[in-house]
UniProtKB/Swiss-Prot annotation:
Protein source organism: Dictyostelium discoideum
Name under which the protein is recorded: Large ribosomal subunit protein uL16m
Region forming the signal peptide: none
InterPro entries noted in UniProt: Ribosomal_uL16 (IPR047873), Ribosomal_uL16_bact-type (IPR000114), Ribosomal_uL16_CS (IPR020798), Ribosomal_uL16_dom (IPR016180), Ribosomal_uL16_sf (IPR036920)
Chief site of localization: mitochondrion
UniProt xrefs under SUPFAM superfamilies: Ribosomal protein L16p/L10e (SSF54686)
GO BP terms, alphabetized: mitochondrial translation
CDD domains: Ribosomal_L16_L10e
Amino acid sequence: MKIPNRQKFTKNHKRNLITKETRKTGLVLGNYGIKATETGYLKMKQMERIKGDLVKKLKDNMDIYFNFYPLFGLTNKGTARMGAGKGEVSEWYVLVKKGSIVVEFIKSRMTAGAMQKVIRYSANKWPIKVRMTQIKQGLYEKKI
């Protein structure tokens, strides 16, 4: 994954974990998706591991679209005396809110049962709880 090239402020305060997503709650591009059921942080290493596992399991059966991008920097000061500043950005993370669609699967050539197995396998790698969502003929979203 890429890191942000340029930001106005790279050293941010930590975000509020109580909020709930109101905008990205439905599937837009694909038939299947992974929805977050709790709020939490995803670090860049965790994102890479999840992406690699999904690509390995799905192979060429469908395209994967990730709805997140690491925008916030996590700083690490190290060992220094007081008053030396905040520290440099050591890694990047993204805030995933409860109810947001995190991953969408496009052009699916798999059944719902096979897709559930893949998502259950990858759900163990996530630092937050996730579940699978499915859209039926573009009309409504079904919880699985």
